[in-house]
Regions:
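FMN-binding flavodoxin-like domain, especially the glycine-rich phosphate-binding loop
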Residues: 2-29, 39-133
């Protein structure tokens, strides 16, 4: 059974997003298809954010970022992990991304995580965020 109010948003990391969605009983949605109505109608999000070199969001995520700022996020819970990017190079930008979501009313759930780093453990991260989504 899918938890309709949780949406896992991904770009090129569909397999990881679907695994997280399965663990949460949520829906996985491509960043290319997320729209303002879905953002307004959902209560919680897991964002699988991607960065290009020099700490820039990928074009699809940049567009989604604008969508997430076009509507109020008040009361919405958002967990963020970086699937493409370098923790050393992108950490400040990723933290700023989270801060901007908070400025728009979102509550950031859990710690910002980077897939593929030594401390990354998908199961542990999902267990940590799931009670708060």
């Amino acid at each position: 059974m899918k938890h309709e109010s949780i949406v896992v948003v991904y770009d090129s990391c569909q397999a990881i997003a679907e695994e997280i969605a399965d663990k949460l009983g949520a829906e996985a949605v491509s960043v290319q298809s997320i729209n303002n109505r879905q953002i307004e109608n959902s209560q919680s999000f897991v964002l699988a954010v991607e960065f290009q070199s020099a700490g820039q969001l990928t074009p699809h995520w940049l567009y989604a970022y604008l969508n997430f700022h076009a509507v109020s996020l008040k009361g919405k819970k958002i967990a963020v992990f970086v699937t493409l990017g370098n923790k050393h190079d992108d950490d400040c930008v990723a933290k700023e991304f989270c801060e901007k979501l908070k400025e728009n009313g979102a509550h950031i759930v859990g710690e910002l995580q980077y897939a593929g780093t030594p401390e990354w453990n998908l199961d542990n991260w999902v267990c940590a965020i799931s009670p708060n989504l």
